[in-house]
C-alpha cells in the first residue's frame, strides 16, 4: 500500500464530500486530530478503520484505490 496515495486519496474524497478533517474525525468516532494525523503522515488507519473510512465515503475498498474514480 502506498502511504502517500492513501493520505492524498482521503484528502481528495474528504474535499469532494465537503467536510473538514475534524468533522470526519468525529463522524468516525475519533478525536479532532485523527484524520489530520493520517493526512499529515503521522499515522495510517488500521484495516478496520480503513473499511470505516470507505463506508463513510460510500465507496468500496476497490473504488478507494481506483485513481480514476
Q: What does each of the following model-derived ranges do?
A:
Residues 29-45:
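Recognition helix of helix-turn-helix/homeodomain-like DNA-binding domains
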Residues 1-17:
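A short, Lys/Arg-rich alpha-helix, primarily the initiator
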Residues 39, 49, 68:
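DNA major-groove recognition helix of helix-turn-helix
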Residues 22, 33, 62:
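Key DNA-contact positions within bacterial/archaeal DNA-binding proteins
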Residues 48-63:
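DNA major-groove recognition helix of helix-turn-helix/homeodomain DNA-binding modules
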Residues 24-25, 53:
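Short alpha-helical "recognition helix" segments of helix-turn-helix
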Residues 16, 27, 56:
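Residues within the alpha-helical elements of helix-turn-helix
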Amino acid at each position: 500500500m502506498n502511504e502517500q496515495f492513501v493520505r492524498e486519496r482521503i484528502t481528495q474524497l474528504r474535499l469532494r464530500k465537503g467536510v473538514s478533517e475534524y468533522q470526519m474525525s468525529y463522524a468516525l468516532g475519533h478525536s479532532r486530530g485523527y484524520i489530520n494525523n493520517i493526512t499529515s503522515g503521522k499515522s495510517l488507519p488500521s484495516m478496520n478503520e480503513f473499511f470505516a473510512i470507505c463506508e463513510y465515503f460510500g465507496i468500496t475498498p476497490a473504488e478507494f484505490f481506483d485513481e480514476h474514480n
